[in-house]
């Protein structure tokens, strides 16, 4: 004979498994737009999230995505002709939209540029999902820090106002990958929450390490927008060092600079950096640094090597010459040797292919293809940290409320 109390409790727990927005209440599903090689997926998977759909239209990135996530439905078409209402609903939709028109290396056209304007397309897709009863509960938008300042902050304001019109509250934070891997990579995350499911949190602007000057300015300009501030902890102290990232390359490998290339490096290295390197060469200890080749500032357009002595790599970029190329500089046994950063090292700087992080992630394509893909991607542990301390904090509360409803029914029956 069935236990009526147990049955009633189970019915209460599963009452909303298929809610009005089309997704199972207990499932943590997401749609990954601008998916690239899938590093948002890699960040979410250990937290129990399942990809309902991925979308990108770069053939090389798509091959890499399919190699690592063959089970995920992947639509390889322009997002502008993608009808998300044709696909299963998801609790979360993510968008690492193109940064080229926002970044310092781009033409600074902002949201009017050909590429970065696709965030408007993304927001239109969210609006369409609302109209077909598949409104996502959460959104995650990621991009470069210039999103906060370009065109006097009007690009960010446009995104936030559109989210408000779609009845989402939002938090905006800046997180640097250097707290997780030895890479200086500061990024902006917009976490949006459906106000129909989660009451707005009205509180003072938390002027902290995650919400610095430009964000404070955005809040002062728009205090009446539905800001939804999360209680983030302090950013963690990084455990990985640059030595953990660097491959062990045999000294006989041709990837190391020859004498002519080494002399070229010494001829272009910044003066103060050259003095530091010369002093370290005399010290007898081994050291590992990264370096980039840049244009000398405030002078003629001539190249110069800058060496980082802070234990970090510079922000990974897509290959294209100039400062997009990073070098590994090693001092050992009184000698200086150098080479280009490898594809595996680029992957490790983004938090995969490491014993602690995604050791089985597959690198697909040529060395240049891999560097391009990772230069255009996200830092996996940084994204995971943002999700863990924002969206993840809301989902358990919902589950507890459903469970509490079942317990209350049990007490009533008893």
Can you annotate each of these PLM segments?
Residues 38, 59, 98-102, 145-146, ...:
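Short, solvent-exposed loop/turn segments at secondary-structure junctions
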Residues 17, 252-414:
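C-terminal target-recognition/interaction regions appended to catalytic cores
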């Amino acid at each position: 004979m069935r236990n009526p109390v147990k049955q009633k409790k189970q019915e209460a727990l599963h009452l909303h498994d298929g809610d009005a927005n089309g997704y199972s209440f207990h499932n943590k599903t997401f749609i990954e737009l601008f998916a690239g090689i899938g590093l948002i997926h890699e960040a979410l998977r250990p937290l129990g999230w399942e990809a309902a759909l991925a979308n990108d239209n770069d053939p090389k990135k798509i091959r890499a995505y399919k190699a690592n996530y063959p089970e995920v439905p992947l639509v390889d078409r322009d997002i502008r002709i993608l009808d998300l209402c044709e696909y299963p609903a998801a609790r979360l939709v993510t968008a690492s939209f193109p940064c080229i028109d926002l970044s310092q290396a781009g033409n600074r056209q902002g949201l009017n540029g050909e590429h970065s304007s696709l965030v408007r397309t993304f927001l239109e897709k969210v609006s369409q999902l609302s109209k077909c009863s598949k409104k996502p509960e959460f959104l995650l938008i990621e991009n470069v820090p210039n999103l906060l300042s370009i065109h006097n902050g009007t690009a960010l304001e446009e995104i936030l106002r559109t989210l408000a019109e779609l009845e989402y509250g939002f938090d905006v934070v800046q997180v640097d990958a250097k707290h997780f891997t030895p890479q200086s990579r500061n990024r902006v995350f917009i976490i949006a929450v459906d106000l129909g499911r989660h009451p707005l949190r009205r509180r003072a602007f938390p002027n902290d390490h995650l919400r610095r000057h430009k964000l404070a300015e955005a809040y002062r300009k728009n205090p009446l927008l539905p800001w939804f501030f999360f209680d983030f902890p302090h950013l963690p102290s990084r455990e990985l060092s640059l030595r953990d990232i660097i491959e062990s390359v045999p000294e006989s490998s041709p990837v190391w600079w020859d004498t002519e290339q080494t002399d070229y490096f010494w001829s272009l290295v910044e003066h103060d950096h050259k003095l530091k390197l010369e002093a370290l060469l005399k010290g007898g200890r081994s050291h590992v640094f990264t370096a980039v080749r840049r244009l000398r500032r405030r002078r003629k357009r001539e190249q110069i090597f800058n060496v980082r002595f802070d234990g970090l790599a510079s922000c990974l970029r897509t290959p294209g010459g100039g400062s997009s190329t990073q070098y590994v500089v090693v001092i050992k046994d009184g000698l200086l040797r150098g080479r280009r950063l490898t594809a595996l090292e680029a992957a490790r700087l983004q938090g995969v292919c490491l014993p602690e992080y995604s050791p089985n992630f597959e690198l697909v394509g040529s060395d240049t293809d891999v560097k391009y893909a990772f230069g255009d991607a996200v830092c996996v542990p940084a994204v995971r940290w943002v999700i863990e301390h924002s969206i993840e904090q809301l989902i358990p509360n919902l589950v507890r409320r459903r469970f509490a409803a079942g317990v209350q029914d049990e007490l009533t029956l008893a």
